[in-house]
């Protein structure tokens, strides 16, 4: 008899709406590329654009193509180039593109394990505070020419 009394409760539980798991935060990665580097180079550089679906942070990057990868920034205080590691990674604001580009934030491949040849691919795994990791192949290509470069201008 007690089993029959539980039957309506079980039936109601089976009909109740199930709670859906919240959608996982995501980060879109576009325009990923790396500069060429000769075999034996001490470092290489990669660039990309990140757009997060919610506030997040790029925390670390890994690549089998290098001993390790660091997130760096570069600036020119007083006309002297200074590069430093961003130990806290890169803050990502929901819906805003965060560019890692020449002359600014970038990924530094420390101890590339071989030549980064034009047309080659560099596998990268990006890890975030909230979003799942993103693995991609960045193409090795020549950097774009500066917008101000011209045939008659001197480059110092």
Predicted feature residues:
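Positively charged n-region of N-terminal signal peptides that target proteins for export
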Residues: 1-4
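Compact, glycine-rich, soluble single-domain proteins
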Residues: 22-156
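Residue-level signal for mature regions of secreted extracellular proteins and peptides
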Residues: 8-9
